[in-house]
Amino acid sequence: MGRGKIEIKRIENANNRVVTFSKRRNGLVKKAKEITVLCDAKVALIIFASNGKMIDYCCPSMDLGAMLDQYQKLSGKKLWDAKHENLSNEIDRIKKENDSLQLELRHLKGEDIQSLNLKNLMAVEHAIEHGLDKVRDHQMEILISKRRNEKMMAEEQRQLTFQLQQQEMAIASNARGMMMRDHDGQFGYRVQPIQPNLQEKIMSLVID
């Protein structure tokens, strides 16, 4: 007796639904990998769980973005709006421009120049000479600025030295003034006790 046909409908029990999703998901990914290897097919798989988690698989020979682009071209269905297409074109343009600049930089460094013709080599030579002129000009600006700064520092040093000398002279002058005042004060103190004796001697002479 054969198995009865299982009705396909939403599993109400949350735990059973999670278990079934995990099993069926793993089975789908396994089948996608098998058909990729067995049939040399380009396979992509994207699954979104009920909780929003994404599970994806893409064959090793092509990334998912390239596969979606191929799908869009072959099916005629637009997966991206005009804004995204313009953005994609801008990215491609910037990438090509970057590759061109990288190649030009290698040429300026003397690399990969075997394929250049005479006209291109002359253009590279002109670019190098122009770059050298700009480097020399900037180098001269730095040297002039350095000398100017050194001159300013020397002038500041001279002014500081002069101010220091003036301060030292003022301190020395103040010290000499204090020493002279101290000396005068000591002399007046010694003479003071002698003055009464002189007055007594003068008085005795007057009386005699």
Swiss-Prot record:
Transmembrane segments: none annotated. Keywords: Activator, Coiled coil, Developmental protein, Differentiation, DNA-binding, Flowering, Nucleus, Transcription, Transcription regulation. SMART domains: MADS. The keyword Endoplasmic reticulum does not apply. GO terms for molecular function: DNA binding; DNA-binding transcription factor activity; protein dimerization activity; RNA polymerase II transcription regulatory region sequence-specific DNA binding; transcription cis-regulatory region binding. The keyword Nucleus applies. It is found in: Nucleus. Residues 3-57 form the MADS-box domain. Pfam families: K-box, SRF-TF. Residues 84-170 form the K-box domain. Induction: Positively regulated by the meristem identity proteins APETALA1 and LEAFY with the cooperation of UFO. Repressed by silencing mediated by polycomb group (PcG) protein complex containing EMF1 and EMF2. PROSITE patterns: K_BOX, MADS_BOX_1, MADS_BOX_2. PANTHER family: SERUM RESPONSE FACTOR HOMOLOG. Mutations in PI cause transformation of petals into sepals and stamina into carpels. Probable transcription factor involved in the genetic control of flower development. Is required for normal development of petals and stamens in the wild-type flower. Forms a heterodimer with APETALA3 that is required for autoregulation of both AP3 and PI genes. AP3/PI heterodimer interacts with APETALA1 or SEPALLATA3 to form a ternary complex that could be responsible for the regulation of the genes involved in the flower development. AP3/PI heterodimer activates the expression of NAP. AP3/PI prevents GATA22/GNL and GATA21/GNC expression. Forms a heterodimer with APETALA3, capable of binding to CArG-box sequences. AP3/PI heterodimer binds AP1 or SEP3 to form a ternary complex. This is Floral homeotic protein PISTILLATA. It comes from Arabidopsis thaliana (Mouse-ear cress).
